């Protein structure tokens, strides 16, 4: 699986994690706020117990508050909010290099 930890000063939780620094002058994003991972054609997000929380706004407008430690499946065009920052998920269709991985 591909995985990245996002935050103001993220720390890896596994040896092969990628780290994505989120610039946030207001410090609404925790140091290691959230994990995003892609495996077997699916993309998941997990909040690490951040101070200001995270949520997902689906394309239909429905918002789901993330619970610390619970992995949530993302869909294309979902908008993920971390603190006062947000980003939109764009899932690319094509060959999934992790399709042959075992659980």
Q: Each predicted region: which residue ranges?
A:
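Short, well-ordered loop/turn elements at secondary-structure boundaries
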Residues: 1, 39-40
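N-terminal beta-hairpin/loop module of FHA
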Residues: 1-31, 86-88
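C-terminal boundary/linker segments immediately following FHA domains
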Residues: 6, 38, 49, 57-103
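Residue-level detector of flexible, active-site-proximal loop/helix-junction positions
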Residues: 10-13, 52, 60
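Buried hydrophobic-core signal for structured, non-transmembrane domains
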Residues: 34-36
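Short beta-strand/loop turn elements enriched in aromatics
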Residues: 42-51
